Amino acid sequence: MLGHKSMKIMYPIVGTIHERKLKIELNLKFQRLTAFFPMEIATRGGRMVRQYKVVIDFSNMKTIYQTTTADNCCALVIPLETPPQYYWKSPNIRSTFSDETKNWSFTESWSRATDVIEEAGLPMKFPVTLHADFKDCNFVDIGRWTTLRFVLNTSTEEARAANNQIVSALDDFNITTQVHDSFQFTHGVQPEMWKHLKRQVPIEGQKASQMLDYSLDSVVHLSFEVRYQLEVCISRGHLNEHTITKEFLDTIANMSPTKAKLHLEFAADKALRLADPMNLFQRYREEGFVPISRIPPYCGLVRKVVITPTTIRYTTPNMEMSNRVMRKYKHIEDRFLRIQFTEELEKGRIAVNKDQNDEIYKRVLRTMYKGIRIGDRVYEFLAFGNSQLRVNGAYFFCPTQHTSCDDIRRWMGQFSHIKVVAKYAARLGQCFSTTRELRGISSPETRHIPDIERNGYCFTDGVGKISSFLAQLIVEDMTLDVFAKPSAFQFRMGGCKGILAVWPNDAKSMEVHVRESQKKFESNSKGLEIIRCASLATATLNRQTITILESLGVPTRSFTDLLDQQLKSYELAMQDNDVAIDMLTKFTDEQKTHVHLANLVRADFRTKDLQEPFVVNVLKLWRAWSLKMLKEKARIQ
């Protein structure tokens, strides 16, 4: 969509290919619109016609525009906020059968598609980028071209009735249809803005002579921070790449990089959707924008990239707590990327162990091997921590003349003795734990002490000692608001990890006692890094302790009686303020949210005469969360 009533047609699919026709299917039960279309592709065995389908959820459709074509046909224009899901049909249905499963559905013959292109293996040769300029005449950018136009047959009375039925059914689901006979359509080519931006360096499969296609007079040079923020606005839909002109690019290029970046950050922060990019400068003057003014020493600006099956989305640099690697290479922090693989619109994780997602797995493989291209930079895979692994993420790095990914990994430590792939990745991720370095102390005095073992069991696995003096320094450096000094700290120090217990009798002055079980690898980094401190918590039972107590002879009835008593207390707390205050102050959380909620109840925000909606709803949320913890972790008091 170029505007409210304007659309650029990038690729038309017309008529019939090898007796395979276009078809639309409306499924009211699953609330989705499906369009089937054929495409001719080239494979190793020759050329063939592949059947595709695009599935559009009703939740992705807000408004439909109905127009009339020059030959009096009805056309439906469907603009989508996010890319729909594309599938291709397997030509060999028998290959989708499996001996391991007893059930088979016809949907299993359809596999997810990440590209619609004539040469199927072409994308695997290039890095993942926002603007894919493949030299393929049948390439359809399904991640960026998110407006679909369907020209419906109106030659017969039956066809016209079916068209009206589609519009009426969509209207029942609050998808309004607006009739616009003045809707404008233009047949366009690739956006002009990419021709004016500085050309990328030649990569594998690309000839250097292609860089001479454009004259130097038409090239607009943008600094990387401005180029990155521009792609943030384009990938998020704040600016339309088809409406960005050379005038707009020249305007931001003539600004200072800081000022140009602020204008683009303003568009992303306000979530603007500008049909005319030149309006950005007027909106900025009228509303203004206040960026992040001060970054604490233990934080840094992190650029995040979300890779979906069909496109890529960039995020404005955000302030986050740093890690050991980011602190070491703070002078080139803009060369780090934190990436995450998700479904479309970040709806969740990509499903694993699903044969229909092979193309999505190939896209992940392409990202890991070929990298991510932003401007003239190509970011390569570096490593991932445990927290990134849980959300399907990783860290990428763009090499410089003096620093490569291998150089960073060598600085992180010696991992050559680790032969298990999973353990190797986990040890690399140990350096990416979010930590706070103890300032003013480059390296504490480290003493190695043995583990305590009895009958083949290690009773001190991962537990070292720290002096009370160092513990006090940590409390002051982290400005902890605590009533009692923490008794233990979760830490990282070089290749060591685990917890350090405050031990005044053994650890003196600046000493840290590390056990052999805490040492995972050798590293040149010796600074003490703290992840979190011990805090007060309410002692409860859990599934593990219940299992142990039952094996020691405690009857199960004892636990069920305690559980019933606690459930009755939660129900009574929704009626009796005294019971609610008692339970809220007894089961407190680290953020002291329960204490604040108890103060609201104590201040008569919930009485027989006054039921303040916010307090009542938060109390219901507290009860639901507590019951969830009882069900999942058996936290019985």
Predicted regions and their residues:
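N-terminal recruitment modules of adaptor/scaffold proteins
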Residues: 1-74, 79-122, 128-146, 151-181
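Conserved small-residue
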Residues: 116-637
